[in-house]
Design a protein with these regions (language model features):
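A conserved structural/catalytic subdomain of Rossmann-like adenosyl-cofactor enzymes
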Residues: 2-223
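Short acidic DE-rich linear segments
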Residues: 226-227
Length: 227
């Protein structure tokens, strides 16, 4: 395994060096697992880190798959900090993480995805250039693109690009088209997104009640000071 910070998971657009490295590793089916570790594990930095498990000898059940493991909650607090290091992973927690890895199952701490789940095609959306109310055309009669209106979309590799365009883009930009010559495939792993758990917002009544209670506490403290 290799320990990285979060940047190599997602930094760089399609076609960039970072994305091309991810693409190379994933399309060759070498990425077996990514394990998120707790923050504040290291002496010189408090940032979160990730272990990339890379191999060219995947077992049959792991072929074409990537296992993500959220190990961010597996830690004990140190009695005394050492620089930025305030947490450690004890033996029992290491065993738990190893067991999660070996079980290769979807659960609270483990998510399993097909390789292509992390890939997308960045497509360029063009719109016609208009001058004096008329669409400007080239010698073949095709509309010329307006670079000022140029946009892009990320289409998951699991989706058909034409169908995505018809569903998501064309209804809003009926005169637009895709310039397939500019399409590029990229890969990213948005780790926290896959383990996100929605927490309902507190109601306004609860917040108002808490503010009233805090106000009363403040008034009582002020009265004690004045007395």
């Amino acid at each position: 395994g290799i320990v990285f910070n979060g940047s190599p998971l997602f930094t760089g657009d399609s076609g960039s060096g970072e994305s091309e490295i991810r693409k190379w590793i994933i399309e060759n089916d070498w990425l077996e697992s990514v394990v998120s570790l707790p923050d504040q594990l290291f002496f010189n930095t408090g940032i979160s880190t990730y272990i990339w498990v890379v191999t060219n000898k995947k077992t049959p059940q792991r072929k074409g798959k990537v296992q993500l493991i959220d190990g961010s909650s597996f830690y004990k607090s140190m009695k005394k900090s050492l620089g930025s290091k305030r947490k450690f992973i004890d033996d029992s927690q290491r065993e738990q993480l190893l067991q999660i890895y070996q079980n290769f199952e979807d659960n609270e701490h483990s998510k399993i995805f097909d390789n292509e789940f992390f890939g997308y095609t960045k497509v360029t959306i063009e719109q016609p250039k208009v001058e004096n109310g008329e669409v400007v055309r080239d010698k073949k009669g095709n509309p010329k693109p307006d670079s000022k209106l140029r946009d892009s979309e990320r289409v998951p590799l699991s989706e058909d690009i034409e169908q995505y365009f018809s569903r998501e883009v064309e209804p809003h930009l009926p005169n637009s088209w895709i310039d397939f010559n500019k399409s590029k495939v990229g890969y990213e792993i948005n780790f926290t997104k896959y383990f996100y758990q929605y927490k309902p917002l507190r109601s306004s009544d609860d917040i108002s009640q808490e503010l009233l209670e805090l106000k009363k506490e403040s008034e009582n403290l002020l009265n004690l000071i004045m007395d």
